Structures are given as C-alpha cells and as structure tokens.
C-alpha cells in the first residue's frame, strides 16, 4: 500500500477524488497526512467530515517560513511514499529525501500557463485569452520552481471558440 501526504489550499476537491478512489478500491493507498495551507480554507471542514485529520500549516500570525518549517517537520515524521500537491498554491521546499516523491497536478499543458499565480480559473482565462485550440492538464514531479519538473503525464482536450473559462 502506498502512503500519501496531501497538501491543499482550497476546497479539497482533488483530495476528495483520491479518497473516493481509495474507498472504491481503485487506488491501493492510504492518506497518512493531510495539510491545509492556512486555517481559512473551505476544504478543511469538508475533508474532516470524511475522516481526515487536517494539519494547518499557516495560522493567522504565521509567516510562510513558519508554515514551511511545520510542513517539513510533519513530512519528515510521516515519511510518506508520495507527496501530492492537490491545489497547493505555495512553493514547497524540496528536501533531498523528497526528490522524485512530490507530484503536482496543473490545469494546463505545461510549460504553457504555469508559474507563480497561475492556478485554477486564472489558467483557464489565460488559455481562452490566447485563443488556444487545445488545453489539458499536466502531472509532474516537483522541483524548486513553480510548475516545473519532469512531466509524468499530460492529457489534452479541445477548446472551442465558444468556450468560457468556467
């Protein structure tokens, strides 16, 4: 069984999908650590209702450095097989033991429409603004840069001229 740590910054939809796959027996994994980027995001209650204990990286007065130190300690204690960035918006410092274990899902075909601040609806708006005929998603290993690192998988979809970001 693969042990997973998940980090999220929003509603937790990707983590919910993982939980469903695990519960349905489609994914032989266990989430051993769930980390919310800050204490105000909606996914905390949603995922807690599904039985996950949620660690909060950044409380009201914490700096990002404080949050990164907490995350590092939690990850070093849990030592998961894989660390999944499930809509996690901060840059995660990659420690040597984490190389090749941290994966990100990005809602575009990287390297296009990636980088700091390019997430969610912003990515889809950029795809439409650039009149791209195709878009898609990328799963990649994470390195020290936003939306960078070796690609694992890309899936494409057509974008019609009538398409909206939603």
Positions of PLM-derived features:
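One-carbon transfer enzymes
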Residues: 1-166
